[in-house]
Design a protein with these regions (language model features):
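Beta-strand elements of modular eukaryotic interaction domains
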Residues: 31-35, 58-61
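Structured alpha/beta or helical-core interaction and ligand-binding surfaces enriched in interleaved
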Residues: 13-17, 39, 106
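N-terminal chloroplast transit peptides
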Residues: 1-2
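Short acidic, S/G/P-rich loop/turn micro-motifs used as interaction or catalytic elements
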Residues: 12-21, 49-53, 76-77
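Polybasic, proline/glycine-rich intrinsically disordered low-complexity segments
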Residues: 53-108
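Eukaryote-biased feature marking scaffold/signaling PDZ-domain proteins and nuclear chromatin regulators
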Residues: 37-40, 65
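Well-ordered, non-membrane alpha-helical segments in soluble/globular domains
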Residues: 19-30
Length: 108
């Protein structure tokens, strides 16, 4: 099994979807990836299941139940998003592991 390092930002769904121009930001990023022929390396996850890990017990106490995450293998992209969006939490994890079996899992 190949273990990958993932980076993420997470915030309330209300904040990222309604209050911030997230759609525009992601659309521009996808366009940039197409122009540079780079493979998409980020995912938008509603109610990400990796947050159910014991690793994030303290973080989930600070988040609303209805949160959303952007997960990527690109640390620079996540750092850029943090600077662009401000009111988000940032973190990283390895997956798949025993604690996080489905790194890109989510609930609807």
């Amino acid at each position: 099994m190949v273990v990958t390092k993932y980076y993420f930002i997470v915030a309330s769904n209300q904040f990222l979807i309604t209050e911030e121009p997230l759609e525009e930001v992601l659309r521009e990023r996808i366009q940039y990836y197409r122009i540079t022929k780079k493979r998409i390396d980020f995912w938008l996850l509603p109610k990400p299941t990796f947050l159910q890990s014991k690793l994030y017990k303290d973080l989930t106490k600070q988040l609303p139940e209805n949160c959303i995450a952007i997960v990527s293998t690109n640390k620079i992209f996540i750092t850029w998003l943090k600077l662009r969006l401000n009111n988000v939490f940032i973190g990283k994890f390895l997956g798949p592991t025993e604690q996080i079996q489905n790194p890109l899992g989510f609930e609807l």
